Amino acid sequence: MSFFQNTCKPKGFAGKIMVNMMNTGHAALAEWGLTHIKIRDDDFCLDIGCGGGANLKRLLKKSPNGRIIGIDYSEVSVQKSKKLNRAAIQEGRCEVLQGNVMNLPFSRDSFHLIAAFETIYFWPDIQVA
């Protein structure tokens, strides 16, 4: 598997390293972006392409009484997101699903906010998604 393919859909041991690198490497831009978005303390948010779950954690912090769902099509990413957000998942404030942006299991109008941090360039068809 090439480096680029492992950024798109992390797999195996190299994928675990990639997900950790993304959690760290994407932090500054994600934190900056979140300063420009109004998120209420009880919002229901979706993070498409949640990767290693760092942005789920940020959204949970900005919406302490809200509920956050993350979805990613990489099994490695889903596992890391669940591990990083275990407490919020146990509290019922967070859910992490494995799935594809092209076939989301809910309607778009279900959420107050839908985010996609550094992921849309991997989507096969942005207009359809």
Predicted segments, located by residue:
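Hydrophobic alpha-helical segments typical of transmembrane helices
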Residues: 17-18, 29, 33, 55, ...
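Conserved alpha-helix/loop element of class I SAM-dependent methyltransferases that forms part
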Residues: 24-43
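A short acidic, Gly/Pro-enriched loop at the edge of an enzyme's catalytic core
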Residues: 102-113
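Class I SAM-dependent methyltransferase SAM/SAH-binding core
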Residues: 44-103
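A short glycine-rich, Lys/Arg-flanked "PGG" loop and its adjoining helix->strand segment in the class I
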Residues: 127-129
